Amino acid sequence: MLDLNLNADSPESTQYGGDSYLDRQTSDNSAGNRVEESGTSTSSVINADGDEDSCSTRAFTLSFDILKVGSSSGGDESPAASASVTKEFFPVSGDCGHLRDVEGSSSSRNWIDLSFDRIGDGETKLVTPVPTPAPVPAQVKKSRRGPRSRSSQYRGVTFYRRTGRWESHIWDCGKQVYLGGFDTAHAAARAYDRAAIKFRGVDADINFTLGDYEEDMKQVQNLSKEEFVHILRRQSTGFSRGSSKYRGVTLHKCGRWEARMGQFLGKKAYDKAAINTNGREAVTNFEMSSYQNEINSESNNSEIDLNLGISLSTGNAPKQNGRLFHFPSNTYETQRGVSLRIDNEYMGKPVNTPLPYGSSDHRLYWNGACPSYNNPAEGRATEKRSEAEGMMSNWGWQRPGQTSAVRPQPPGPQPPPLFSVAAASSGFSHFRPQPPNDNATRGYFYPHP
């Protein structure tokens, strides 16, 4: 082991009368024979011829030129030789920056400070470096819409082997909304992104960038969710079930094709019918503002009579008695010169001439109005009346006591009975006139002989 503290008293000094080894070395060597070398060190091994009782362990001693101390009595020595050279092997400064540079960039958790503290009590201090806080990694944005689809790289897109198409779905209010089936996964992902932006705003988790859908969102910003989903389905290649090339047609497992209108169109049809019936007070499925065009068209067509009743009038005559069938006095038959009336065929007969039961002496008009127009054909009807009186003279009721013989029918065509048989669908029973009683035969029948 090397003893670097050579200026201290060694055991050899006691054997030479208290003189140090450096002093003896100076006295033995002359000034002319001593060679001074700067920057180099010489070492000499001295085998001392000590006494027999001296310690045998003292074998050799190392001497360093940098620790040589010149004698003050020698005046011929140079100033460089007389001056003591002091070199500190360990820095005294408290900071260990120099040692850290020497050690390099090797990092150690704990290291011992070997420098001497002259101010303090000289205790060895264990310095623990302050740990540098590790950089906090950026938090990865956690998806709020669940994991990605296993069958597709895009969110909200699923491939179905049965149909062979890519279908897009989105969750809204706890329900899965079908957006349509597409031939490619890219088209299905586009449909999902549009629906996600419409439902959840610009913070939605989408497959592509938000700038790709700016123009699309401007066009559909006034549409509701149901209307927007209906548009996306219209852009798809069909419905999820079946493989029909026609829109709205579905193939079921039983092998039958079914035509569907969908809830959206059904609600629209109901709302339009309710508005046409109840106007602005109607209760609709969608907002009333979306049917503003229907309301305006209804107000323009308010003067149109949608009554399905049959009217034969050409003018705007008011309804009479709330009936759907109107028969005004100026009918088509009246314009042709035919008067729809029934005259009493027995106006000129004597009192004792019987009249048929149910005959009337008043003219019958279908509209119930008082006749104010005389037909020119009335004269011809009066001439025919005299002929009819001769034909009807043999008609009458059988007097009591006479045999019930079949009377011969008058020659010529028989007139049809007037209101004798009710219509089959009218629901009224057939009307059959009954002969008057005996008390009402005065003036109509002869007395018994």
Curated annotation (Swiss-Prot):
Organism: Arabidopsis thaliana (Mouse-ear cress)
Stated induction or repression of this protein's expression: Repressed by miR172a-2/EAT.
PANTHER family documented for this protein: AP2-LIKE ETHYLENE-RESPONSIVE TRANSCRIPTION FACTOR (PTHR32467), ETHYLENE-RESPONSIVE TRANSCRIPTION FACTOR RAP2-7 (PTHR32467:SF118)
One Gene Ontology cellular component: nucleus
Compositional bias of kind Pro residues: 408-418
Spans through the membrane: none
Keywords tagged on the record: Activator, DNA-binding, Ethylene signaling pathway, Nucleus, Repeat, Transcription, Transcription regulation
UniProt keyword Nucleus present: yes
DNA-binding region: 153-209, 243-292
Compositionally biased region (Polar residues): 7-20, 27-46
InterPro entries, per database record: AP2/ERF_dom, AP2/ERF_dom_sf, DNA-bd_dom_sf
Protein's name in the database: Ethylene-responsive transcription factor RAP2-7
UniProt keyword Electron transport present: no
Places the protein is found: Nucleus
GO terms classed as biological process: ethylene-activated signaling pathway
Annotated stretches, region: Disordered: 1-52, 124-153, 393-449
